[in-house]
Amino acid sequence: MPHQQILMLFGLLPVATNISTWWNFGSMLLACLTLQLLTGFFLAVHYTANINLAFSSIIHITRDVPYGWMMQNLHAIGASMFFICIYIHIARGLYYGSYLNKETWFSGTTLLIMLMATAFFGYVLPWGQMSFWAATVITNLLTAIPYLGSTMTTWLWGGFAINDPTLTRFFALHFILPFGIISLSSLHILLLHEEGSSNPLGTNSDIDKIPFHPYQTYKDMLMLTIMTIMLLTIVSFFPDIFNDPDSFSKANPLVTPQHIKPEWYFLFXYGILRSIPNKLGGALALTMSIMMLLTLPFTHTSKLRSMMFRPFMQLTFWTFTATFLVISWTATKPVEPPFTTISQVAALMYFLFFISNPIMGWLENKIMKL
């Protein structure tokens, strides 16, 4: 067994002294995953994957099953917590140049895609009005694929429309994907500890390290406590804060909701999809909104790893963050002026971040004579 693994077993994993709170979100994601697995199992025990019974089974869980309401709310709001943590975790990776650790970054991006797929399948399961129409809109994007599109859509649906087979396979996928997430998370952590964590300065940490326990373990526990308090506060006092009113009506294929929109954590991607008035173009932009993350290790031209000493890149990063929020906001609005224009400009700026990344690096190298 390699030397580092032995150290890890004893909690003596060496960690940079100067890593900030932004490095705590990895352990928080692990806690979220554990919570989702436990609550998900107890919900699956009582859930019925049938289009006539799914909606009623959710009502049965919340009303009749002991602490079922708590399991259901913890699972739904836990998913939101999961995405809050993963978006902060990715933003930290972007800001501090963690993407230069290629294997870890690629496994992390794959984890994000798997998480998004799992969340989408889970959103369909209650078979509410918004679940049904969100599934219809998103799965319909497959038809935009030339030649294979229609065949793939029919294969995914299990028929010529979204029906009982669709719900059954979505439940099966929602159940099995988290096991893939667990496996890939283990690989992600293993690959990270091959090289070790970065630090805010983006320098080599070898000269100044401390043991993981007790320093980082207590820091992790503090952040986990804060997250638990937030989660339980929302579950207890504002359980429907992330819900859509249409989710409380049973799916009706004959009535289209006024405004179809996904959960808040998919709004940025949905906004990018909607900003392009072409089905295939929108589907490609949607895919690229995530896939662009994979280009970052190859487009990093700066001699400095972290953005801590790169003012131009900091401005670009915070513009990107604001753009992300603006796209999410416009995606909640109807498709009419001025929202269409705002969303198109924001989508363009979103992709410009990835294009400007190498240019900014080169420019900063010139200015600082590196």
UniProtKB/Swiss-Prot annotation:
Query: Which Gene3D superfamilies does the UniProt record give?
Result: Cytochrome Bc1 Complex, Chain C
Against Pfam families, the record matches this protein to:
Cytochrom_B_C (PF00032), Cytochrome_B (PF00033)
Compartments annotated for it: namely:
Mitochondrion inner membrane
Q: Can you tell me which residues bind a ubiquinone?
A: H193
Any idea which positions bind heme b b562? H75, H174
Which GO molecular function entries does the Swiss-Prot or TrEMBL record give?
A: metal ion binding; ubiquinol-cytochrome-c reductase activity
* Membrane topology listed for this record: Multi-pass membrane protein
Which residues hold heme b b566? Answer: H89, H188
**Where are its TM segments located?**
25-45, 69-90, 105-125, 170-190, 218-238, 280-300, 312-332, 339-358
Name the InterPro entries for this protein: Cyt_b/b6_C, Cyt_b/b6_C_sf, Cyt_b/b6_N, Cytb/b6-like_sf, Cytochrome_b, Cytochrome_b_C_euk/bac, Cytochrome_b_N_euk/bac, Di-haem_cyt_TM
Q: Which cofactor does it need?
A: heme b
May I have one GO cellular component term?
respiratory chain complex III
Recite the UniProt cofactor note for this protein. Answer: Binds 2 heme b groups non-covalently.
UniProt KW keywords:
Electron transport, Heme, Iron, Membrane, Metal-binding, Mitochondrion, Mitochondrion inner membrane, Respiratory chain, Transmembrane, Transmembrane helix, Transport, Ubiquinone
Q: Name one GO biological process term.
A: mitochondrial electron transport, ubiquinol to cytochrome c
Any keyword Metal-binding? yes
UniProt entry tagged with the keyword Transmembrane helix: yes
PROSITE patterns in UniProt: CYTB_CTER, CYTB_NTER
Signal peptide extent: none
Subunit-structure text: The cytochrome bc1 complex contains 3 respiratory subunits (MT-CYB, CYC1 and UQCRFS1), 2 core proteins (UQCRC1 and UQCRC2) and probably 6 low-molecular weight proteins.
Q: What does this protein do?
A: Component of the ubiquinol-cytochrome c reductase complex (complex III or cytochrome b-c1 complex) that is part of the mitochondrial respiratory chain. The b-c1 complex mediates electron transfer from ubiquinol to cytochrome c. Contributes to the generation of a proton gradient across the mitochondrial membrane that is then used for ATP synthesis.
Which family, according to the similarity comment? Belongs to the cytochrome b family.
This protein's name: Cytochrome b
What is the scientific name of the source organism?
A: Chilabothrus strigilatus mccraniei (Ragged Island boa constrictor)
